[in-house]
Amino acid sequence: MLLPKRVKYRREHRGKMRGRAKGGTEVHFGEYGIQALEASWITNRQIEAARIAMTRYMKRGGKVWIKIFPSKPYTAKPLEVRMGSGKGAPEGWVAVVKPGKVLFEISGVSEEVAREALRLASHKLPIKTKFVKREEIGGESNES
């Protein structure tokens, strides 16, 4: 599971998810990737489930890059507890994802394998995504 080694504050405000992603909108490391089309929180468990789905389908071929990190703690109060009496205990970690952000990248496999692996990974995520190639977004191809 992905989580920060240490944080300055154990609890954070929820914040707003307005606008599009500022950075990380292009495929830099691999040849193929999946790009978020919606804004959402993605938990560390969902990221891990997507990673496992991809790597199992690729059967140890190729390389996977995870471009998001769950650095935001979210809290929850126990069930059947009255309102008030402070903020709840930290429950888990989430990555804030905005539209346009590339979530995962793959290289070292054919386009068909990459497309299917990323499709399987996208089913583990709570948002709509689209398959993107390095050339489509405007970067240069690695093949030279």
From Swiss-Prot:
InterPro entries: Ribosomal_uL16, Ribosomal_uL16_bact-type, Ribosomal_uL16_CS, Ribosomal_uL16_dom, Ribosomal_uL16_sf
Record GO biological process: translation
Protein source organism: Bacillus velezensis (strain DSM 23117 / BGSC 10A6 / LMG 26770 / FZB42)
Subunit structure: Part of the 50S ribosomal subunit.
Keywords tagged on the record: Ribonucleoprotein, Ribosomal protein, RNA-binding, rRNA-binding, tRNA-binding
PANTHER family in UniProt: 50S/60S RIBOSOMAL PROTEIN L16, LARGE RIBOSOMAL SUBUNIT PROTEIN UL16M
GO molecular function: rRNA binding; structural constituent of ribosome; tRNA binding
Origin: domain of life: Bacteria
SUPFAM superfamilies: Ribosomal protein L16p/L10e
PROSITE patterns named among the record's database cross-references: RIBOSOMAL_L16_1, RIBOSOMAL_L16_2
S-S pairs: none
GO CC, any one term: cytosolic large ribosomal subunit
Protein name: Large ribosomal subunit protein uL16
Alphabetical list of Pfam families matching this protein: Ribosomal_L16 (PF00252)
CDD domains in the cross-refs: Ribosomal_L16_L10e
Primary role: Binds 23S rRNA and is also seen to make contacts with the A and possibly P site tRNAs.
Gene name tied to this protein: rplP
Family: Belongs to the universal ribosomal protein uL16 family.
